[in-house]
Amino acid sequence: MPTNWHSVVLENKEYLSFASNDYLSLANDKRIIKAAKIALDKHGYSTSSSALISGYTASHHKLEEEISEFLGQEKTLLFSTGYQANLGVIKALVSRDDNIIADQLNHASLIDGSILSRANFKRYNHNDYKDLEKIVLKCKTKNNLIISDSLFSMDGDIANIKKLSIKARKHKSSLLIDEAHSLG
């Protein structure tokens, strides 16, 4: 039974929980709880359909704009889950004749998105950018997408985004970094 999202109590002993995604401890933040209650009173619990059908609201649009401003980006697109985001984004970026070169320890959603995209899918040894470069050099087609987590959720390793960016530019490849476990 959770005492908070960062620990669990089993047989009267408290243990650290590694199953939480509440990295910033916002789940029990009083300000967020208050804002959520106000939003529930104003908008109800559900839009009763997905954004694709009729569930996209002015609040969703406002959130996208605020995230874009925070990140200094032109646009933001909300997805219901990180898993869906990875599937949707990867499929939008590659076609069947393209190459995906991905870190071996990427999150399952990145692996599934890569496989489901039907692009040529290759994996390089974890955080081994020389291996990445060897694989890119063997790719026959021009359009390559390099994919990596920034923070690997299962072991806490951090990708070297600067090196990945340099390799991507050098080989005229696109780069997709999943920030789900770092930025959130």
Predicted features and spans:
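N-terminal "arm"/small-domain region of PLP-dependent enzymes with the aminotransferase-like
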Residues: M1-Y45, S173
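Short, small-residue-enriched loops and turns at beta-alpha junctions
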Residues: S25-L26, I53-Y56, A108, L151-D155, ...
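Conserved N-terminal alpha-helix of the aminotransferase class I/II PLP-enzyme fold
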Residues: K34, I38-T81
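Substrate-binding/gating loop at the entrance of the active-site cleft, primarily
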Residues: T81, I101-S117
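Conserved PLP-anchoring active-site segment centered on the Schiff-base-forming lysine
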Residues: V89-A108, Y129
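Short, structured coil segments at secondary-structure junctions
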Residues: R96, S117-R118, H171
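Active-site phosphate-binding strand-loop segment of PLP-dependent enzymes
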Residues: K122, H126-I177
